[in-house]
Structure formats: C-alpha cells, structure tokens
Regions:
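Conserved small-residue
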Residues: 1-21, 270, 489-605, 645, ...
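Glycine-rich, aromatic-lined ligand/substrate-binding cores of catalytic
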Residues: 604-637
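Predominantly transmembrane beta-strands of Gram-negative outer membrane beta-barrel pores used
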Residues: 43-69, 83-89, 97, 175, ...
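Residues embedded in well-ordered regular secondary structure
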Residues: 1-73, 113, 176-177, 556-574
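Acidic, glycine-rich flexible loop segments
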Residues: 2-29, 43-45, 116-155
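Extracytoplasmic gating/loop element in the C-terminal half of outer-membrane beta-barrel translocons
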Residues: 5-7, 21, 155, 289, ...
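Extracellular/periplasmic, surface-exposed regions of secreted and cell-surface proteins
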Residues: 42, 85-104, 112-113, 124, ...
Length: 661
C-alpha cells in the first residue's frame, strides 16, 4: 500500500481508518525538513596601530554574524570584539602597559521540549526517535501531525519556543615594569579584572497535534517562561622581583621571587512561571500560573593566594640547574588543610658543549635532562565543601492552613579536603643538527597524582545522606612522547622555497593505585566508578559467541532474565552471550570487581598511540600548510541512545549492554 500510494500521485498520502484515526503513507525526509543545504555568515575586521619609542598603541575590532542551519526558527549568532593595548615608556627604567578586551555575544536558538522544562531536547535525538519517514508534517486540514510536534518542528515553525542568550565579557590588565638596576634587578607587577554577565531568557510553549479529524493531543502539557542571570568576576594581582647578577662568561644565574592573589565571585538568579497567555509575547505580567519561582540559583566567593620562586644556574652553557616552588592557599579548603607546597627541580647536560664534541660541527645541540616537579590542583566545584550545610525545603503538609519550611539533613564533611598533588618524573633528550634543520625530542615520564578529589566510602542507607567527595584516591600515569622535524629552503626560479615537516607521537596509560572506598563498583558509560587497581578507560561487557541459529537454541541457552524486558523472549538472530561463571545465568552479579558475574574487560576507551603530522611549503609569498591528527588505537562502544549506529536495535538490547547502564 505504501509503495502504491507513493508511485501514483493520484493517491492521497493519508487516509482515515475505521477508528477515525489518520494513517500516513508518506515518504518524508525529515532532515530536508529541518536542515538547510548551507548557511551563511559574514565578519568584518578593523585595526589601527601607531606610536613611537615612547608610546605605542593597538586597537582592533571584529563583527561576526552567522545564520542558523535550520529551515525555521530564526536561529542566529552575533559577536562583537574590541581589543585595545597601549604601552608607555615613562622613563628609561619605567614601563607601563594596559590591555583591554571586550566581547559581546547574542544567540537565538529554537528549542524542542518533551515536558515543562527549560532543558531542551537535542534535535538529533528527536529525529532519531520521532521522525518516521511514513509520517507527514501536516494533516490534510493543515493541522500538525503528532510527528511534527514530537520532533519539535511545529515549535520551530511557530517560533515561540526558544532560548536567547546575551553575554558580555570585559577583561582588563594593567602591568608595570621597573628596571631598578639595568638588566640586573627588575621588578614587575600587574593587576587584572575580569567581568562576565550572561542573561538568558527561555520560553517553552505547547503545541496541538491531531491524530484524527476529531482527536487531538498536546505536547508539552503546559507552558513556561524563565529568566536567568549569571555574574562572574575575577580580580587578580601578582608581583615579581628578578635578580640576574653579572658573574662573568662562565656562570649564569637568575633568581626570581613573587606572589599572586586571585579573588572570584559568582552569582546566579532565576525567575520562572508557568502559563504563557500570549505565546509570541512571553512576559511575567502575561502569565497565569499560580506559582512563581524566585531563587538564588547558586552564589559563592572563593580565593587563592600564593608565593613562588625560581632559581636557574648555568655553567658555560653546559651544565644546567633549576629549582622552583610554590606555596599556595585556597579558601575552598578548611583552615588546617588550606596550604600546600609544590617544589620542582631539573638538571640538564648539554653534551654538544663538551670538549670531546667540539669537532662535531654538524651538531647544534645535544642535551639530556631530568626533572621532578609537583603541581597542586585546588579547582574543586564546591566552594564550601568543608562546611556542613543544611538545605531549606517547604513541606507538603499544612500547619494551621499554611505550609511551613524545614531544614534537611546536614551535608557530611570529608575527612580530608586539600590539594590534589601531581608529581611528575621526567627524562628527556633534545637533539638539533645541520644548522637547526633537523630536530628531535623525546621524553619518558611517570606522573603520580595523590589525594585525588573523588567520592569516598559508601555510607549506610540509615545515615540519610550520600558520601561526600574528598581526597580518597591516588593514580599513576606512565607515558612517553617523541617528535621529529625537518626544515630547509632552496632557491627556485630565483625565489626562496622553504618547507617544513614535523611528526609527533605520544602515549600514556593511567591506573588507580589507591582508593579508600572498597565497594568496587564497575565503571559504566554514564559514570566513572573507581576501584583500586583499575586502569582508566576500562570497558566491561559480555562475551558474545555469535547469534542464535534457532528459537529452540535461544530458549535452551542460559537464563537471560537479568536483561529481559516485560514478556520479551530471546529468539533466533539475537546475540548469544556466554555464561562464563557457569551458574546458568548471564548477568553482571553485583556489578562489582568482587562479583561481576559474566562480565569481562572488553576494551578501553583511552586513546592510545596518538600522532600528529604538520607540514608546510612557502614560495614567493604563496604558502600552504597542513596538520593531521590521529589515534592509533581506541576502543569505542556507542551509548544506548546512539540511534544512528544501532538503528531499531538501540533500545531493545540496552538492558543487555552493561556499558549502557
């Protein structure tokens, strides 16, 4: 019937069945419905520069605008940038400079929603699940079909479900450099300010569809208007003093010390209300919902302060020594765990400067080096994780006819909350020859990350709260990297032809060496669960032994009830998973490293043997460059919603794929 109606234009692509419901016989390409073949954009740039020995300046501006890729919905993006930089040499020993960046962005994006929520669904997912080719966009009377509403196309066309963002960024840095003793003692200081303001407006409207001449539905089941504002500020300052004494031709010494301070502020407010009266003009005065949500959607302040130093020494450019360190404090940690010291050191020997290499004129540089260095990471998401906080909620019960507020259970405080510390041990080799044309560099390293910020031991259910994050794990990363490059130039037709090529290869693996939580829960596609001894990126799954050849074989195989939905039965053509532990069931046990049933490691998602190739050629003002990047090995398993990969088998087998859960 479908083929007959599509081959003969005299037949309608729809009919009303005996239940008074539309039946469709379309051949709709929903990608053509939604997407343009191309989109357009334009940008304009302007810059002005000038000055002399005493003062110089640079000012640039950019305007960029691009239309969206959808055939409806008026998607648009606009951006304006202005950058200004000025330098003034007030005195031969005093230099002042200032840099200001301003950026303004505006975006209008049509959205699709399955419920009264400002979290939109992605178009690709809605097309995957709701865009049936046999379905039509509109009914014969011009009303929307269910597919048109469920995919979001109706909202795109009517243009009243959208998200509009307007963002402003201002970044200013002022720096002063004072040459106290010319080329010997130099002081420098700077102060910077960053401000970001984001205003977001969102409208969610409902759309009516008809499944028959007299039957209709609505999606979403209501409407909502929301306004959010985000405000971010950062003030930072630093100062350094560098001492470089003159010690003769054989010795070179540099000593630098300084401090820095950073202060961050974040504020977010939200206001929303349901019941849009006029879909094209959402406004809080034109909403009929009874409840209006007004709340502080997250506000915090936090800061960093630190002191640092670096001492570098070189003897005849042959033996190289360097020591450095930082002492940092972070307001996100409790007072007794707030500070951390992170030292580093390195040594190097330029073999090419040794006496026995003096006659190797082809060799420019040959250096071996070793280093050990530590760095602290204090960028945890919660600025007040060291405080036990209690949320305030509103009871659903009445007290004298009114609802009342109550406090929820206080949040637990982790035993240890301090800096993550990453210590890297590195051995390296640098080689340069033939007047800098040939270069080779290689490193092998081990990085030990201690006090990782992760979820701690699972708490008993009677505790009434989830386990807090803290410093509960350590990790070891082993890796190497190498690069080889060649560059040269020749005369071609009286003009210089220059070319270059560079190949780089690198690899690393990471393993959890300590984890205080002993639950041993296996990782999945949607959550990273650590256990001691785990290699990062592990994928666990069932071992497959082909497909069932008959229904009888499927029914007499191991028990599949662990991942059988409703009354479904396994039959010929379904995958045949192995019962590896011989208990008669194919399942994941307790889904832990101690009891994983028939699960085995089937791969690893970590990219391995990554590589890049860069090259370029330039002649007579004409140039071409290229860059290739790749991964030598990586295991990948698509998620259960990857409909473009799984097709109609995406959800039927999702219960049988533990990596999905």
């Amino acid at each position: 019937e479908l083929a007959r109606r599509n081959s003969d234009p005299s037949y309608e692509k729809w009919r009303v069945n005996n239940r008074n419901v539309y039946e469709y016989f379309g051949n709709t390409n929903w990608y053509d419905v939604f997407y343009k073949d191309y989109t357009t954009g334009h940008q304009h740039n302007i810059s002005v520069t000038g000055g002399g020995d005493v003062a110089s300046y640079y000012v640039s501006g950019r305007m960029f605008e691009q239309d969206g890729i959808y055939n409806a919905g008026d998607e648009k993006y606009q951006q304006f940038n202005v950058k200004a930089k000025g330098i003034v040499n007030v005195k031969p020993w005093l230099r002042v400079e200032n840099t200001t960046d301003f950026m303004s962005r505006y975006s209008h994006q049509p959205t699709s929603h399955t419920g009264i929520s400002t979290t939109p669904m992605t178009v690709s997912r809605m097309l995957n699940h709701q865009a049936y080719p046999v379905a039509m966009v509109t009914n014969p009377d011009g009303t929307w079909t269910e597919a048109a509403v469920y995919t979001g196309w109706a909202g795109f066309v009517e243009g009243n479900s959208w998200r509009k963002d307007r963002k402003f960024d201002v970044n200013n840095r002022t720096a002063v450099t004072i040459d106290l003793l010319k080329d010997v003692l130099v002081a420098a200081a700077d102060v910077s300010f960053y401000f970001n303001q984001t205003d977001r407006r969102q409208a969610v409207n409902s759309y009516t569809y008809y499944t028959g001449p007299d039957s209709s539905g609505e999606r979403p089941s209501g409407s909502l208007y929301e306004e959010r504002s985000y405000n971010r500020q950062k003030v930072a300052s630093s100062a350094t003093l560098t001492y470089t004494p003159r010690l003769g031709d054989n010795h070179s010494l540099s000593i630098m010390g300084g401090w820095n301070i950073e202060d961050y502020t974040y504020k977010s407010n939200l206001m929303s209300r349901e019941g849009i009266i006029i879909p094209g003009k959402p406004n809080f005065s034109l909403l009929e919902g009874e409840a209006m949500t007004l709340k502080d959607n997250g506000s915090y302040d936090w800061g960093l302060v630190g002191a640092f130093y670096r001492v570098s020494y070189s003897y005849k450019g042959k033996y190289l020594l360097e020591a450095s360190g930082r002492y940092d404090g972070n307001s996100k940690f409790p007072s007794n765990q707030r500070w951390g010291f992170f030292p580093s050191g390195s040594v190097g020997w330029r073999i090419s400067e040794a006496n026995f290499m003096k006659n190797a004129n082809w060799l420019d540089n040959l250096k071996i080096r070793a280093s050990v260095g530590s760095a602290g990471n204090g960028l945890i998401s919660d600025a007040y994780a060291y405080l036990s906080t209690m949320s305030i909620a509103q009871s659903s019960l009445l007290n004298n006819g009114s609802v009342f507020n109550y406090t929820q259970a206080p949040s637990p405080i982790p035993k240890s909350l301090t800096w993550e510390k990453a210590t890297t041990y590195d051995l390296g080799l640098d080689f340069e020859a033939f007047n800098g044309r040939l270069n080779f560099s290689a490193d092998i390293y081990r990085k030990k990350t201690t006090d990782m910020y992760v979820v701690g031991e699972e708490l008993p259910a009677v505790f009434g709260n989830s386990a807090p994050k803290g410093n509960y794990a350590d990790m070891r990363t082993d890796g190497w990297e190498a690069s080889l490059s060649w560059r040269d130039s020749h005369k071609v037709a009286g003009k210089t032809l220059s070319y270059n090529i560079k190949v780089a290869v690198w690899d690393n693996t990471s393993k959890i060496t300590r984890y205080t939580a002993k639950t041993g829960t296996l990782p999945t596609n949607y959550s990273i669960n650590y256990y001691e001894g785990m290699t990062l990126g592990e994928m666990w799954g069932y071992k497959c032994d082909g497909l069932f050849q008959s229904d009888e074989e499927a029914q007499t195989w191991a028990n599949y009830s662990k991942f059988t939905n409703r009354s479904a039965t396994w039959q010929a053509g379904d995958p045949r998973y192995l019962d590896l532990n011989g208990d008669g069931y194919v399942n994941n046990g307790n889904n832990t490293i101690y009891d994983h049933g028939d699960l085995v490691k089937i791969g690893n998602t970590t990219p391995r043997y990554s590589y890049s190739i860069q090259g370029g050629v330039r002649w007579n003002g004409i140039g071409i460059s290229m860059m290739w990047q790749g991964v030598g090995k990586r295991d990948w398993y698509p998620a259960k919603e990857s409909g473009y990969f799984w097709g109609q088998y995406g959800r039927p087998y999702s219960m049988a794929l533990p990596w999905h859960n």
